[in-house]
Amino acid sequence: MRSMIRMTLAAAALGLAVPALAQNAPMVGGAPMMANKTIVENASKANNLTTLVAAVKEAGLVDTLSSKGPFTVFAPTNAAFEKLPAGTVDKLMKPDMKADLKKVLTYHVVAGKLDAKELMAKAKMGGESANLKTVEGATLTVKMDGDKLALIDGKGGGAFVTQPDVDQSNGVVHVIDSVLMPKM
């Protein structure tokens, strides 16, 4: 009887602890981002990253971004994709454009886990900016713009980090406000 009471109390305590843990997790797109989940698992729950998740699936990158990593992902929001010229997303999502889509997406990924503090330190050490080698193979420039982290792509376009340091089991995500475009 005592063991039954202990088990009931333990289950009740766990039931109270799980929502408390979720409340401490950073929220992205209305969903808690759990540090014990992968980049893909967490992004799939965020209602402001649905275009990114659809693109990751279309490009065949789910397994890669679910693997051990670690990765630093600069994750453009749905609004970021909407800033692209009309028809760009639809064009990239076509099966015959898979290689270009993969190139764009992997341009948003850096090997290793780089939090905002490390990115800022790299920019300061580089005398205002630093180059990051992306998984795509090209470089992305990170710099400080006031108190914000800014990214400059291969075409001179830029994005600001709007939500830094969203820890994942296989890296870190920094939510950004524009899609970065490599030279194609």
Question: What annotation goes with each model-predicted range?
Answer:
Residues M1-L9:
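Bacterial N-terminal signal peptides that target proteins for export
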